[in-house]
Each structure stands twice: as structure tokens, then as C-alpha cells.
Amino acid sequence: MPIAFTRCGSALHRVVARSAYSPCAARSYSSYVFQENDIVLVQKKTDSSAKQILSKPLRPGKRVNTSSGHIDHESIIGLSPRAIVSTATGKGEYRIYRPTLGEYANLTARIVTPVYPADANLIVSLLDLNPTVPDPSSSLPSPPLEIFEAGTGHGALTLHLARAIHAANPAPPPIPSRARPALAPDSEEGTSDAVEAEYQAAVDKWEAYKPTRRAVVTTLDISARHSAHAKTVIAGWRRGMYAHSVDFHVGSIPEYIASRLATSPEPFLDHTILDLPDCHLYLETISQAMKEDGTMLVFCPSITQVIACLKQARKEGLPLVLESTLEIGQAAGVGGKLWDVRAVRARSFVRAEAAEAEKAEGGEEGVESGTEGSEADVVAETTPKEAEPLKPESDGWNMVCRPKVGDRVVGGGFVGVFRRVVK
């Protein structure tokens, strides 16, 4: 580092001239460089509003296709985020980024519509997840925090859930790949045995690791194709950063819950998210597997489906209470639009029912005074949390369904927040 001395009067001062190319001056914001198997975001250097391109995992010999020509993966590997790279033809310059989780979820190839980042973040926040870090000094194993997602779909919501809990788990071993390395035709049998032994050792390590997890997302889909696609989406994010916190299953909800309860009759689910048609048909099955005070979210495209869940829960006398209903989507705001969904009975019906009860007991006096006052008000103003179990609809129950404030706006769907309570 160059050092110069200047004299001011009788004092000699040392002046340090830092070179523009010294390590400290040239230090970038991040020392990270892109490596093989990373996924990058590519965008035109001169147009921040241009379409973003999500690359495939970086590998030698592969390329990113753009409107100005292709970019070889080799020219990206070794560069830092926000670096500029030219196309092979030299006709265009592009800036490369590390994609955010939301950008990755939006831009990955899809076979079903994903849950968009704003909605996924809101849904995760409604669960109020607070997983604890592993305690190496504890010798007593505790049951893990388990979130059940019915309807894996694209895997975007699964990815957001896994991000919220993955820090509670110890560092995982490499997840064994189902695709075993292909052997050359002239390979020896001993080589094949070695590959098989290595693969089996990786499987054994992974199976030994799974019981040590303190938080897990169990995701189920009826379609094997959707589940397999979601698995690749999870594995592609930062080289499978959250893959160890997710268990994928294919099948129906009744079959899966029944198989789990057959091995252990105790409730095992802390929270549940239902993102599938006819959610109300599965409430009874899932409530048997949910722990007390757990949260069940039903994510539906229409408000009538949330109403169907509320009616089903009360009709069957299930230990589920509807705490709130939110409309989500870009038009509803970041925090969701609150809806008032509850079951009520008209005061006139309550008075008539009370009169019938008095007649059955042989007296009719005091009916009006007994029902006109506080009792009728309490019934009419009952909140979802305080409501008694709903009797059949012939008993006079009706649904209140309206936005809490203002008029209804078109949104991306509705979330009903149910709480598992003591029966």
C-alpha cells in the first residue's frame, strides 16, 4: 500500500494512498460466486423491466437462450451475482442474479398453477410457526412439529413452509437420488456392486437421519405426476436447501391418515393446510389426527367452499372452530381482506323455540321477557369462537357471509382459519 509523507509546519504527517485496486477497495458486497448446479436469473442489462429468464442448473455444455442469442453456462460459472455477461454473438449484455424464493417459485416450469409468493407468505404467517433449534444436550426425543399439506400441486407453498421450519433441523446427509449412475456397457461387475453399496449406504444414512428432525412438512397429492414435479421444484432451490424438511406422499387423505393412526393412535399433526376441491369432506378424518390447539387452513377459490367447511364442522359436531376468513390476492391487499363468516339464528326463531320449551314444561308465562332481552342479543351477536355446536339447518341456523369492511373485491381465493379445540 503506497505511503507518502507531507510536512505541515514542523509536523510530519503520514498519508496513506489506498489503491483503487487494493483488496479492500475492490471487495464486493458478497463473495459468493456461481457454481455448477446453481440456478441463476438472467435479465437485460439496460432494461430493468425486461422479461426475466430462469436458467436450468448450470452445467458445462449447456446454455441459456435469450432474444439476443444464447449464453453459455461456462461463461456464468465463476461470476458473482449482478455481474454482466455477453451473449455468444456479442449482440446483447445481460445481468445475472441469484433468484429470490418468490422469483424462483413464479418462474419454474409448471404443470399446475402455483400458490403465488404473496399468498404463500400470508398462509405461512397464519400458522404462526415458531420452531425451536435442536438441543444437543437433551437426551429425551420429542415429537417433531409436523405440518400436513393436502394438495402438493406445484410445490410453491411447500417450499415456503419448508423455509419457515428448516432451521429447526440438524444438518442433513446427502439425500440419496433415485436415479442411480448409469454404468458403461463394458464395466465390471465389481464396479456395479460398489455403486450399489454406495447407494445403499446413502439410503441408510438418510433413513437414520429422518427420526432426528424436529420439524417436517408432510405433503400429499393424489397425482403422482404432480408430486414428482413438486419434488424437482423443491430439489432445485439452492441445491435442495430445504429438501430434507419435506416428505412427499401420493394417495388419498383417508388412506394416509388411516395408515398413520394405525401405527400410533395419538394425534400427530400440529397444523394442516387443505388446498384441494371439496375440503369439507375431509374435515372429520383430519381432525382425528390433529393435536389440540392446532391450526387448520382451508384454501379455497370461493367463499362458498369455506361456508361448506363451517357447516360440515358444526353438523358433525367436529372439534373445529372457525376463527377468521380472509380473502387473499393482489386486489385484497398484502394482509388479506377479512370476511365475516358465522352461523346465526333469527331472534324470532329463538323466541318461538323458547315458547315451545315452556309449553312442554306446562307453563307459558315469562316467555317474552325471557327471550326479548340479553339471551336473544347474545345469540345474534355470537362470534365463531363462542358459537355452540350447530344443529341441523332445519333448526333455523343461517349463514352470515360478507366482507368486514367495504365491498367485495375480486381476489385470488379465500382462507378459512379453523382451530382444533377440546370437544
Predicted features and spans:
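C-terminal substrate-binding/active-site "lid" region of AdoMet-derived donor-dependent transferases
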Residues: 2, 283-414
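Conserved class I S-adenosyl-L-methionine
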Residues: 128-155
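Helix-to-beta-strand junctions that scaffold the AdoMet/dcAdoMet cofactor pocket
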Residues: 165, 169, 290-292
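A short SAM/SAH-binding and catalytic strip from SAM-dependent methyltransferases
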Residues: 266-281, 299-303
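Intrinsically disordered, low-complexity glycine/charged-rich regulatory or linker segments
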Residues: 1-115, 129-130, 363, 375-423
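Glycine-rich SAM-binding Motif I of class I
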Residues: 155-159, 280
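S-adenosyl-L-methionine
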Residues: 183-274, 335-337
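Helix N-cap at the beta1-alpha1 junction of Rossmann-like dinucleotide-binding domains, i.e.
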Residues: 177-179, 224-227, 303
